[in-house]
From Swiss-Prot:
InterPro entries: Alpha/beta_knot_MTases, tRNA_m1G_MeTrfase_C_sf, tRNA_m1G_MeTrfase_TrmD, tRNA_m1G_MTases_N, tRNA_MeTrfase_TRMD/TRM10. It catalyses: guanosine(37) in tRNA + S-adenosyl-L-methionine = N(1)-methylguanosine(37) in tRNA + S-adenosyl-L-homocysteine + H(+). Its EC number is 2.1.1.228. Belongs to the RNA methyltransferase TrmD family. Coiled coil: none annotated. This is tRNA (guanine-N(1)-)-methyltransferase. It comes from the Bacteria. CDD domains: TrmD-like. One of its GO terms (biological process) is tRNA N1-guanine methylation. GO terms for molecular function: tRNA (guanine(37)-N1)-methyltransferase activity. Homodimer. Its main location: cytoplasm. GO terms for cellular component: cytosol. It comes from Xanthomonas euvesicatoria pv. vesicatoria (strain 85-10).
Amino acid sequence: MRIDVISLFPEFIAQCAAFGVVGRAQERGLLELQGWNPREHAQGNYRRVDDRPFGGGPGMVMLIEPLRACLETVQAADTRPAPVIYLSPQGRPLTQALARELAQLPRMVLLCGRYEGVDERFLAQAVEMEISIGDYVLSGGELGAAVLVDVVARLQDGVLNDAESAAQDSFEGPQGLLDCPHYSHPATHAWGDVPDVLRSGNHAAIARWRRKQSLGRTWLRRPDLLDEAGLEKNDRRLLDEFRRELAPDDEK
């Protein structure tokens, strides 16, 4: 997959993507990441990329022409069709389901805004989709782009050492539940012991425990994700069991 990022700070994206899963994806040739600075396409001695908004008001607005020229160069560098995605608090919320859709694309172009945003005419003519990583405002779209690059990169075949890691993540699967708790060594610690079932070697019992914990954790922490009416009978039974086992003082 190829991801082109249009940003006034392309080095920021490159640094974020140099480590961990995204860095591994690039090393393995599974992800190509390229940054583009619209300032290089601006005119004049100062290479200005922003100006005051019509109608007055605070802040500056990113200009059409540097962005248009930059995008033209990006599209000429690789002729494969690619949606232009603007990182914006007004966009469609980024979910795991949307990430899976985007991960199937051969290429996409990410646009990072700054200041008060981007001239609306550029957005109307050049942008296919706006995506938000949350209901808050950042100084620019670079952090949002870094998040999107990471979530899409880890879904590429061959990036994770164990493909099951992605399949068992929170929000994965047809029902999009939260993940169950995980434990490692030591089995006994001053802060608690690993549940006996996870050390039993009984794979059926372990799978049942993990499913119950996943259902229960979703019910406790993200009830908006849990459509109880759509749960299978066995899942409803497990959730009821989880509720019965939950001590009153554990309910937060």
